């Protein structure tokens, strides 16, 4: 069973870990203080469930696991956060709870609490012991407790403060325990009272101070840690866990707290540690792998390392003050909590399978203890050996001294000037060798054992040594060095001196740090040293000759007794000298050691000074380099500015040149009709200017490239400087490490101060003892006064007094001698102590002076020293005051004693006179002796105290001198700091200048952007005007072209068949060329469209990729959600299974309880039956009572009869005896009968009383049953209420609750029915009781009348009264119960109303969810609609495109393949769109799947609810279930609620995400639609442009190529500019980043320096420099805020710049496109102008020729007429072949018309009709008849005449001309045939005329057909002259 339980617990813990692996975060808002209520009365925070937000700005929302308002209790907080952690800590899971917040926000209140309101710590301890009591049978527990505080970054043990005072506690790492504080006291704990006592003990020693914010603010972080070790009794498995409860000190502002001095120092340390904590949590919340987390920056984070993101289940309680004044601090705490909420932990069960590990641990501890014992034994043996060696050496020395004495007694004299041999020769060297060998062996054994111990420790904790701190490594290095030095020293030769051996011994002693050696080294004075040296100079070894002489003298002279005595004295003196000499040698050795150490430290100091100088030089070099870099940056910026200025100048020049060119173009357009050469010159100028612009741009780009190279070189140099800077930082770190090692040395020197402090404390204790002695003396003085009073009564004799006085004087003299001896001894000891102190102080002062000169970082220690000195000052002042008081008191005592001694002498003189009372005198004498002894002791002690005071004064003077030195050093450091501050200010000024430069650059950039935008607007305006002008010209051109076309058709009709054929041929050639050019143009356009489509495809692909990524993200999120839900469903399923088991149990219990209910119903029925029986019994009893009444009447009658009989008896007495006897017999018989009747009546009465008692007992039983029923009813009601609460929380649907309500109503109805029946029964009972009472009263009245003397009646009355009292009590109880039932009903109704409101809210939520689903479906439907619309639009565009393509296919059949390819490409795009739609459909399917999953979840919830319904049905019968099970069910249901709430939140989040993604999809679709529309517009534009540009392609190929090349160069230039700008932006961003990093570093350095300055200035300039520091911190914060604002502005500007760049790119593309079109149109326009000019000239020539021809024709007609008149008989002319039509220049018209030309006539010229001036024909030569006639085309003349007649408007003249012409041709004479015209004569006249007409008509028809073909070929009318 236990294994199963453990497995279940493990599974539950795993599930909890999967669900709750994040840190639990709760917020608690405390109520307002009295101080805060006076300032502001409104609370700006609004709290709703798990969120907290600002009421003014609701956008600032924060959601957490729990949020507790002002009215919250600590018990609720504990149950929400801490209880689960405490319970899991008992199962082997580590747990931590800590409170975080501002000062005076209620952290200690919530953690510690008070006596009335316990905090989290007390509640957790109580729960731990409760759970231990519950599980004692299963497990054994071992609890250990430790309590520490972190005060000013120093760890202090609150349970053992002496250790923390003696030495610093260090942090280590252990494999099993983790991060551990070494030498921390751990108390084994049995009860909670013991823990509370330890906590109180620690709280008394905790640092607590008062500030402006809080009267008792905690000035340190406290960590209460409990180690819980539990072992299972069956398996033996061990579970280890630690529960850490942390009370953090609050973050504080100096301005709000008003901290000064020590408080400011404490506040800075607190803020520093909290900053590191926030850094750690921010790093952990980022969820990045392989990142550095700064745990080691603070001791708090180092200790709490496993709790923060490690093997621990943690919870954070963030407390907030609701006042408006602390709004910023509260927001910062909330942000901290938000970051902490994202931190994940990896806690696990710390379980050990076997007890082997513990055994190993204990074995290792035993080994350590054994090793320590071995060490102690070896040390003892060493001491013994040293003692033995000292004894041997002393014996040898005694022998030498004896010899020396013999020599002195012999009378020999010692020559001091002689050379003396060394003392070593006189001694026996074997002893020294033995000593050396023994010492070496002992040292070797010690070293070997130490190494073994270290190896064993390393084996035990192999991993802990690797992960231990830097301090441990330093200690190990020191130990290794020590052992190496010892080995090196031990390996020295035997021939070394004794002094060196002694040095080695003393070095080992000093390394072991024994205090006894320090005491022994400093025992004697300097004067004694000089005397001993003189004696030693005397006591040196003698020569052999002198010794022989001394022996001879001894032999010759005799040794007298006096010499023996002197020798003994000399022996004693020599022994003392030996001891003194040893002490001197040891002292000298210690001095040498100290000197060596001082030399080493001086060397180290020099090295450090050299390093510091190097560092300072490097810093100066770095500063110089930085300045050089800044100068280079400035130069580069200036060069960039110059380049930009040049760019601007070039751009302005180019703009000016372009403007000038535009003006010139306008002028040229106006003057184009006049001068063509000027136009060509302008083109040349334009090309030259363009070439100049290109050259300037090339120069600019070369300069730009050079500047880029310069910038790259500067960047490389900057990187090199950064590397050098990092190297120097590493060097600085190494120097800091060395400084830390020196600090450790200082700490070791500080240990020297500890015995001094102990001595001072001893002196203080001795002073206290003196005070006690004085008090005792005062008491004794009072006794003396009493004795003196007795002495006044008794007069003593003078003789005895004199004798006593003599004895007293003798004793006083003895005491004075003893006193003087003791004083001398004390003075000697005092002098020794003073010398020791002086030496120690001198050494300490030397060491501190050297170290203080070495280190600048020893400021804190100087401060601590100053504090200690201040304490010593205070102590000294106290001691001085005490000593002054003592001196005064002693003087007063002396005076009193003198006065009293005088009085005693007077009294003794009187006593001598009287001579009596000897015994009294003896007693007085003894008292006086005692008093004198006490006085002597007091004098001795007083002298000692004076001596101690003198020594303390000396030490105080020395300390004052050290203080002065420290203050001078502080002043020096202050000056250095001021210099540093000035340098910082200079850096700040430089930084400000850099920022100003940045701002100027940004302004320039903005100005450039504005200028670019203005230029773009100007270009747009120009383009719009040009487009308008082009449109107008095109419209006019179209109108005039129509007119011109008509004229052209008329002109073409006059041309001959030859010209027609030639024109056809030319038309075919031109059509081929135009088709080719159109094909090329179409290719280009198609390529452009393909490129645009490819770009579209790319964009669509990118969008598709984004959509795919989003879909993948959605899928991953959905999968994660599904996994989470599955993970959550697993515990729910397990819980369901457990609940099924419980339901089975509950069903069994339900069945049992149904049985109980049935039994109760049966009992109720029985009760009813019993009541009926009782009613029947009561009726029977009433009948019996009536019978009894009748019997009572009979009894009265009998009494009356008795009375009558008595009367008769009296009468009969008077009668004779016989009669009396008879009568007596008769009376006896009657009396017996009466007695029998009376007995029967008594029996009946007894039965009635018994029946009454039985009725009362039955009544009581019924009352009990009723009470039980009521209790069960109340219990069922309470259980039902609880079950309703639990099920209402679990239920969601209203139907379930309605069913519950119905069941509850049924129960309530049944209960009400039961109540009504009970009330009815009670009313019946009360009625019957009343009737019984009445009847009983009647009985009582009867019995009182009849049987007053009988006791039974009294008992009945008393019973009846008690019964009535009980009934009354019962009635009162019933009334109370009814009132309680009414209250319960009211509560039940309230609960009903609340439940109904909850149901309504749930229904509203369901409706909202349904609405959301509907909205989602509507959005889907809308999306599908939009997609369908897009498809329709796409199809329409397809159709349009197909129609246009079909129209183009009619004219250009050769381009069908390309169009088909385009159609294929469009199909591909459509397929892509279809794919997109498919993807959208897939996403909709995925969304549907999500909905289906949600529905499945709802189904599962419904199933759960159905199971809950079953539970409800089962719970209706759970009336007698225990409260513990109900509590467990409540907890489980609350967990389900939390899970459900989390699921709902997740679903809402998913919905929100889906809605956001849908909105994004909609936006994307809108963008796609816009893009499609744009593409359609572009297509239409392209089509129009294609149709408009087909005719103008031939002459524009070269120009387009040139323009393309120019455009490509311009694009390249633009890309280069863009890259340059991007490079500039990147450089700017990099520089900004670097500057920000430098700013942060400088801020950090500034903070550190300000912190150091604040520490240094505490002693001298507290107030002024604190204000400066405050201002500096405020300015730093403002700078930080400004930096943040600047960064935000930079980001915004960067985004704006990006947008502007995009817009510029788009505008540039548009401009390029417009310029291309403009150039094309311009070239076309110029070509049309040139053609038009040529045409005009030709027309003028043709007009002149026509005039001449007209004159000639008239002449011909006249000639013809003449010829007809002269020779009418000649035959008519059939055919007239006309000669060639010639211009004025003699050029034939045929040759002119062969050349096809494109003529584009502007509107202004087309508005006026063409003016025909002359029309010339060649004259007819009629000289020779034999010459060949010139061929003249009649059709040309006809067409020309027809055209003229059309323009003139005289159609009638045409017929006449034709008729005249025909007639003239027919009537030509035969004589003129051979001259100018060749006449072809035919027989019939009609045929000739017909042929002429047919030819003319055919010409006309052909010309018209040609014109139609031309119109079909080109929409733009082009005139072709053949």
Swiss-Prot record:
Residues 456-468 have a biased composition (Low complexity). Disruption phenotype: Significantly impairs the rate of cell growth and, when combined with a previously characterized dynein inhibition, results in dramatic defects in mitotic spindle assembly. GO terms for biological process: cell division; microtubule-based movement; mitotic cell cycle; mitotic spindle assembly. One of its GO terms (cellular component) is microtubule. ATP binds at residues 101-108. GO terms for molecular function: ATP binding; kinetochore binding; microtubule binding; microtubule motor activity. Its main location: cytoplasm. Residues 448-538, 1887-1922 are annotated as: Disordered. SUPFAM superfamilies: P-loop containing nucleoside triphosphate hydrolases (SSF52540). Induction: During the developmental stage. Residues 562-1712 form a coiled coil. Keywords: ATP-binding, Cell cycle, Cell division, Coiled coil, Cytoplasm, Cytoskeleton, Microtubule, Mitosis, Motor protein, Nucleotide-binding, Transport. Residues 22-343 form the Kinesin motor domain. It is found in: Cytoplasm, Cytoskeleton. InterPro entries: Kinesin-like_fam, Kinesin_motor_CS, Kinesin_motor_dom, Kinesin_motor_dom_sf, P-loop_NTPase. Residues 469-480, 488-532 have a biased composition (Acidic residues). Microtubule-associated force-producing protein that plays a role in organelle transport. Its motor activity is directed toward the microtubule's plus end. Cooperates with dynein in organizing spindle assembly during cell division. Composed of three structural domains: a large globular N-terminal domain which is responsible for the motor activity of kinesin (it hydrolyzes ATP and binds microtubule), a central alpha-helical coiled coil domain that mediates the heavy chain dimerization; and a small globular C-terminal domain which interacts with other proteins, vesicles and membranous organelles. Belongs to the TRAFAC class myosin-kinesin ATPase superfamily. Kinesin family. This is Kinesin-related protein 4. It comes from Dictyostelium discoideum.
